[in-house]
Design a protein with these regions (language model features):
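Coupling and communication elements adjacent to P-loop NTPase active sites across diverse families
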Residues: 45-58, 144-167, 265-373
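Conserved beta-strand
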Residues: 51-54, 61-77, 108, 364-385
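Pre-Walker A (P-loop) beta-loop-beta motif of ABC nucleotide-binding domains
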Residues: 68-82, 115, 218-219, 380-391, ...
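ABC ATPase nucleotide-binding domain signature region
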Residues: 78-84, 90-146, 242-247, 386-451, ...
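ABC-family P-loop ATPase nucleotide-binding domains
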Residues: 115-177, 188, 424-485, 489-491
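Hydrophobic anchor residue at the start of the ABC signature
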Residues: 182, 483, 511
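Walker B catalytic motif
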Residues: 197-198, 203-205, 495-499, 503-507, ...
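Conserved H-loop
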Residues: 227-233, 528-534
Length: 557
């Protein structure tokens, strides 16, 4: 008996009716087996991941990043790993994938019967940068389902003719390179999907598409994200990696809750525990104050008495007082402790000399945006003034970063402008072989170094992390370095390319506040709805036909 696979969603109108009629007729006659094709690959049985007492220690500092993690991940769960920058999220993800990690010691047990996985890393792997699209999709991959591949390309508005091109993956925009990885990995047979910051470089429409895919697929998804909206709409289990006590103690929390419920529960528990700790402390202080008065009275009476019989009675009473003191101290050990919280980052601009509000810095009049001979957008019109905060959105590959580079060239020619720039690819500015202190230092003087260390500490860098090579830091920590560099340089105009892309939910509000209160002008490319709404005074969508004004409320429609 043969079989026919039908992707019903790709057919329309009369052709759908004809093929459906013929297929069902043949099936009834016993000539074919009929099945409906879904994006999900078929699997047999239930698959679980059992984690028992998993601890991951960084060898360089002998510091735990994951502490005694035990949990069972059921088939189909959507597990989000969250935590501050540098807390070990990517390390945990790679450990669950079975990767070898020579810089870490892993203790504990991970049991999994999964046979196939798909993985999209936080950064485009070096080995892919020089691969052509043709080789990636047709030579390197033998297990792709091409019906799914082309369907995904259509959904993501990626021209499938480009699959056969000789364009190198490294030449794609950040969003496009992430799109082709999504298409490639989701077209493979897999039982578990691992994603490391999947929404970082995607345009708003594609982020919404990815949310929907994660909710729909039957396979297990384990992912890292700093995007609170993304977390709220996808995760049903939270693994929270925390480093408390000045980043010296690891705490690993697991809750089988959606992100909003988890956040609400944590806030409620924090308030409840804080109140109980305060009540216990007041009761303890009151008991101890009463005890100290009794003890002081007995001591005074002992010193004053000259009667031996009274002295013996007082000595016996003092013995009882001291025994009671030990009981109080022992009981104090079971008092509710004040909850430990990771410290929020503290960073702000000072002594900025902004340009006049009305000063026109850039005037684009019907200009084209091009790369080599290829026109990305035409009829560009834009006026930029001294203290405006302009957000630019648009689909992946439309040329937003190219536009930012064009504006950077124009602003660099203005003598009155002190320009600060934060690229999407941090390595464009960072010197990876230097330590954070060495990178930020300009004079090497003691006073400057102390100031830098103080600033780094306010961004939750531990002292050892200040001494490590920048290449060993997480993406979020590298982003913090660029932010601090901007603050120390005191520019009066900023160009930002996806400035919030690697920062944790705890840091995000502080970063939005940092730029919202910045007195100078800003032009930023961003896909972060909250950032755009809280920071920008005007927003434009870049299209092939120019820049369109966007209403802030339309970002949520």
């Amino acid at each position: 008996m043969g079989w026919i696979g039908v992707d019903w969603s790709s057919l329309t109108g009369f052709s759908t009716w004809i093929i459906a009629f013929l297929t069902v007729t043949l099936a009834l006659l016993g000539k074919v087996e009929l099945f409906v094709m879904h994006y999900q690959h078929s699997r047999k049985g239930n698959h679980m991941i059992k984690i028992n007492h998993l601890t991951i220690t960084q060898n360089k500092d002998l510091r735990d990043l994951v502490a005694d993690l035990s949990m069972t991940i059921q088939d189909g769960e959507k597990v989000a790993i969250i935590g501050e920058e540098g807390n070990g999220k990517s390390t945990l993800l790679k450990t669950l994938m079975g990767d070898a990690l020579p810089d870490f010691t892993v203790r504990g047990d991970i049991q999994s019967d999964h046979q196939s996985l798909a993985y999209i890393p936080q950064k485009l792997p070096e080995e892919l940068k020089n691969r052509t699209l043709h080789d990636y999709f047709f030579l390197d991959s033998i297990d792709l389902d091409y019906s799914i591949l082309y369907r995904l390309a259509e959904e993501l508005h990626f021209d499938s003719d480009r699959f056969a091109s000789d364009q190198k993956i490294g030449s794609l925009s950040g969003g496009e390179s992430l799109k082709i990885q999504l298409i490639h990995e989701l077209a493979k047979p897999f039982e578990i999907l691992f994603l490391d910051e999947p929404s970082n470089d995607l345009d708003l429409e594609t982020v919404d598409w990815l949310k929907s895919q994660i909710r729909k697929i039957r396979q297990t998804v384990i992912f890292i994200s700093h995007d609170e909206d993304f977390l709220s709409e996808t995760a049903d289990t939270i693994v929270h990696l925390r480093l408390v006590k000045h980043r010296k103690k690891a705490e690993t929390l697991v809750e089988h809750l959606d992100y909003d419920s988890y956040s609400d529960q944590r806030k409620a528990n924090f308030i409840k525990q804080s109140q109980q700790a305060a009540n216990d402390k007041r009761a303890y202080d009151k008991t101890m104050e009463k005890h100290r008065r009794v003890k002081q009275n007995v001591e005074t009476a002992l010193r004053a008495t000259k009667d031996s019989t009274a002295g013996r009675l007082l000595a016996k009473k003092m013995k009882n007082v001291l025994s009671q003191e030990k009981r109080i101290e022992k009981a104090a050990q079971s008092m509710t402790k004040k909850p430990l919280e990771e410290e929020e980052i503290r960073l702000f601009f000072s002594d900025i000399q902004p340009l006049p509000t009305s000063k026109v810095l850039i005037q684009l009049e019907k200009e084209n945006l091009s790369i080599d001979d290829r026109v990305l957008a035409q009829e560009l019109q834009l006026t930029v003034r001294g203290q405006e905060k302009i957000g630019i959105i648009g689909p992946n590959g439309i040329g937003k970063s190219t536009l930012l580079a064009k504006l950077q060239q124009l602003l660099n020619d203005k003598k009155e402008i002190s320009l600060g720039y934060m690229p999407q690819d941090y390595q464009q500015k960072l010197q990876l072989d230097l330590s954070p202190i060495a990178y930020l230092s300009k004079t090497g003087e003691k006073e400057e170094l102390q100031k830098i260390q103080s600033h780094l500490a306010s961004l939750n860098f531990s002292y050892p992390e200040m001494q490590h090579q920048i290449r060993s830091l997480s993406g979020g920590q590298q982003g913090k370095l660029l932010l601090l560099d901007l603050v120390l340089r005191k520019p009066n105009f900023l160009l930002l390319d996806e400035p919030t892309r690697n920062f944790s939910p705890t840091s995000q509000p502080q970063i939005r506040k940092l730029f919202a209160t910045y007195p100078g002008g800003i032009i930023t490319v961003s896909h972060d709805r909250r950032f755009l709404k809280e920071v920008c005074t005007s927003i434009y969508r870049l299209t092939e036909n120019g820049l369109e004004v966007v209403d802030l409320e339309d970002l949520y429609s």
